[in-house]
Amino acid sequence: MALSNITFVKGSGGLGRPLAGQDHFSALIFYASALPSGFSSNARIKKFLSLADAEAAGIRLDYADETKAAGSYEVTGIGANGDTVNIKVTEPYGAVIDLGTYTKAAGQTTVTAVAAAIVAIINAGTSTHGYTASNTAGVITITARPGLGIFLNSGTPITVATVGTIAGTLTQFTAGAFSRTAIYHYHISEFFRLQPKGVLYVGIFAVPGSYTFSEIDTIQSFADGTIRRVGIYKDSSAFATGDMTLIQGVLLAQEALHKPLVAIYAANIAAVTDISTLTDLNTFSNYEVSPCISQDGAAVGALLYLTTGKSITTLGAYLGASAFAKVNESVAWVQKFNISNGVECEVLAFANGQLFSAAAITDNLLNMLDQYRYVFLRKFIGQSGSYFNGANSACSLSNDYAYLEDNLTIQKAMRGVYSSLLPALSGPLQLNADGTLSDNTIAYLESLATPNLDQMVRDSEISAYGVRIDTAQNVLTTGKIIISVQIVQQGVARQIEVPIGYTTSLS
């Protein structure tokens, strides 16, 4: 052993210092009737630079907003000295929690005294198992530990084993209600796990009578139009293709206001018993909306699914991966985007709780869901980790904007060209004697349109571009000048084909 000493280990990421630019600016929208302590009905949106910021605003993993399930055991017969009572609770994944064993002792001559002794044993172990108990005239009320939500409400999780003539009546757990804050915390945590230097706006809005998704406009306006992607978590009603059409309409309105962004839609599919019955989205034109149906299968996300009864999805991880990517990069890029940290998202599931290891989840099914334009996690033979199948949009594969990276790239180009051309708006245009645009005017306008596109080329976000202005435009009559911009994208190696075989010689 080394000599005694005091050492320091410097952490990183705690300050949440953001990156330059705004490509990583993101948002999450939740719907709920109750708000964390840092929010109010007049302040439903907050800006976070780290998970610590969110926790300071009341989004903590303390289950303070949870209603813990409670069950009871009424002692009806005190039995004889030496009789025993053992109480156990079965938790998620079959974990059995032993709350202790009571042995009847002399002097405990009433049901109240016996119940008090059992309560004392349970409460003595609270620091270990988290359960608490109380006694009212021989009725022992057992309160679940934090974090179990609705899980204990069904089945027969409490078991009581007695030896001897001691007797009682068992009532199973009821009335557990899950923590919404735990869901918020999970997705925010996952976002910053994938993009530690991200900027995240979080809005928690009242559950509407009918969804219009106007909250996208609200949060984008709050952020002065800087948000590039928004994740929408909707668990109060089921996944609906019509939602994505409504979201697309809001996104188009934002684009018209020079505040373009894309959306990731994560809704409740817990009631979908057969994942193959999901709707084919190729027939829709919601090209700026990406539907996320994946979920962690054995860690925090999976536990939240069991304790809430709601689809949790990998919305936070997907949003974070997109924020970490350059605008042209696919979040399916194997070299860069391993979504698993070895625990979270290591075991894969769909957001209806069905594990990928289930016999029904075949390669043919995964291919079909990919072709149906859904986003989920997958594995590769010989490669550790978990990876998104792609950033599919809810539209036909033939659409120019069939993937989120297509949209993010063109939106960045639009923002850049807009900002550089804006000084020329309502400015004078020098014309030739025949009313056509002069060479000087064309050169000036082209010079305005190009700087941000040049930077995108240098940053390998686009391959090339061209700017064209028709000199014969009738500007005097129309008051409008058309500047055409053509962009050559960066490619994405979605498929790699390798012809291979033997030969007698190499040519």
Predicted regions and their residues:
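Short, hydrophobic/π-rich interface segment
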Residues: 439-463
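Long, contiguous, structured domain-core segments that constitute the functional module of a protein
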Residues: 319-441, 484-507
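Compositionally biased, low-complexity/repeat regions
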Residues: 203-205, 462, 466-507
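Short hydrophobic beta-strand segments
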Residues: 26-32, 228-233, 466-470
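Catalytic cores of large soluble enzymes that bind and process phosphate-bearing ligands
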Residues: 46, 110, 239-245, 405, ...
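N-terminal alpha-helical "arm" segments
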Residues: 1-45, 504-507
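Polar low-complexity, Ser/Thr/Gly/Ala/Asp/Asn-rich disordered segments used for subunit assembly
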Residues: 1-24, 51-96, 101-300
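Long, internal scaffold/assembly segments composed of regular secondary structure
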Residues: 278-286, 290, 297-330, 334-336
